[in-house]
Curated annotation (Swiss-Prot):
Belongs to the TMC family. One of its GO terms (biological process) is sensory perception of salty taste. This is Voltage-gated chloride channel TMC4. Pfam families: TMC (PF07810). It is found in: Membrane. Glycans are attached at N691. The lineage of its organism: Eukaryota, Metazoa, Chordata, Craniata, Vertebrata. It catalyses: chloride(in) = chloride(out). It comes from Mus musculus (Mouse). Its main location: membrane. Expressed in taste bud cells of the posterior tongue. Ubiquitously expressed. One of its GO terms (molecular function) is voltage-gated chloride channel activity.
Amino acid sequence: MEAWGQSPACSSSRKARTGPSLASVLNDLPSAATLRYRGPGVLPWGTLDEDDDEGGRSLQAFAETAQMESHPSRELPWPMQARRAHRKSQATGQLASGSESRAAYWTRQLSRTKGKMKEGFQTIQPWAWTLKKIGGQFGAGTESYFSLLRFLLFLNLVASVIEICMKLIPTWLEGAPPGPPGPNISSPCGSYIPHTHGLVAFPTQLFNLLSGEGYLEWSPLFYGFYPPRSNLAITYLCSVFAISVIYLLCILRRSVSGLKETLLAESDILTSYSHRVFSAWNFGLCGDVHVRLRQRIILYELQVDLEEAVVRRRAAEQTLSQRAKVWSMRALLNVLVLALLGAAFYGIYWATEYTLTLQETPLVRQTPLFKLLVDYLPSIFISLFNFVLPPVFKFIASLEGYTQSRQIVLILLRTVFLRLASLVFLLVSLWSQITCGGNMEAEGCKACGYNYKEIPCWETRLGQEMYKLVLFDLLMGLLVTLLVQFPRKILCGLCPGALGRLSGTLEFQVPDEVLGLIYAQTVVWVGSFFCPLLPLINTAKFLILFCLKKITLFSIYSPASRTFRASTANFFFPLVLLVGLAISAVPVLYSIFLIPPSKLCGPFRGKLSIWAQIPEAIESLPQTAQNFLYFLGTQAFTVPLLILSSILMMYTVALANCYGRLISELKRQIETEVQNKVFLAQRAVALSSRNGTS
């Protein structure tokens, strides 16, 4: 009956006003050239189901296809209805077959165990809540500093355990080590008397503690204490390589994980802010404290993105003359930076060379305080330049017109070059003293291969220099905190006027603090061969530093006015650590292979080189073991190994290229999705305006 339906006139008028169908609109999409599916069994865009039975058959096809998948239902990017069908089909299949295969069962159990172990490890990590609180209140950059400090503390703790197990314990298990050597007139390399016997005054004891001389010079702290036993020499040398490999693997793992975040942050995929607004929140947070911390973290991330966007927009709006002016200014500022670095390096070299001359003067030899100052003269110069120049570099970087992340990188590069190069200049000057300037035919080095008159145990001397650097760095940190930062904060709070503004607000300078950590760790890497217990000292130092920095952070510092990306810190900091590890390996390997060991101290005394102990140990092995070890050094082993490595490298490169093409395709699909949405929005506006006019 027409009373219950529509009149023919209304039906005809509706058909006249009807626009293009949904299928025709979808076929006009920019992505219509490529047929897209939303999952297995889902019909293409623009295809309509005929009836409900077709929809049921679609879900059935969905489930049948899903049954072929090996992933769990919760990991599949499908609708909830399809996941339920997938789960039911899997359960039905297991009931029909009796049970799943043993391999699939153990694979699933192993996956669950790995996930639970990972979650458990994250929950028992020390200071996890402290780092989260720091990140929420002071930003991701400050959190990355404390995360790096915790990471280095863990590495030093592992190295300390290895040093004790492979050096100190074998020394005492094979019998008590011999006492210090006495005067030996018949020795062609002179005599070595590490400390004076008898009672000494308290100031002298304090001086020995700070300089590493006296009773500490002949102790397990330094190289010269360990006796010349073949087994001990092997474990002593093997521990160095074992610790280096552990350091390298841990830093590489940390830097690779940070590289992924950096590439994602620097790419064009996350240029919009929608991913932070819609996907940055953690809906599993409980409690107001956690919620506020997460809000602050998101706020800092958005702040960094907005700051860098403003700088990029200003750079894009510059004219050619303005860009030329900026580049000229950058060139002049870089020349100034090079001049400052050159002056610092010359000062460090002069202080190291002049130390021996000052130590021979009667006034210095008779006054313990002057002798202590002269011994610490290179450390004082290094710490002075490291304290003065980083703020200058920060001011120069602010004048160059870079983004905040780029400024952080430049400050880090210049500061790390200053700190590590200053250490290199110190080592070069010490090498010049040990090897008579590289001239082994000189009068002082001809008999023993090193300057035995001035430095009878050169390994212990190197260990003492690194020990003083570590100790002086800790003392400087404590003094600056107690005598500069706390009084400055009190002055700023008590004097709100001009004097308070002059003192300024303290902000945690992440680049300076991070480079201080990397410099201290590089010193430990250089000195751990000559001072075996230096990692243990550095562990205690980092533990004190962590507690001190945490207290001062919440009581003295205020949140930084300008922050930087966490991805920059997570990748760049381990990269600088790798540079420090590479620099520290050079003097250690040079000492092992090229400089003759001291003839009067250490486990390698009497050898042509430290490495000569390894061939002698190999010759004491059975003939089969000798043949195998010598085979590892022949071309019959190295050439196939090189070929296999080349094949694996080519495979890795090809796999990376495939992944790169896949990523490019996914990026193109994302761009197509954006174009589809814009097109649909335009058509919707056009249709609504057409209906409104009609």
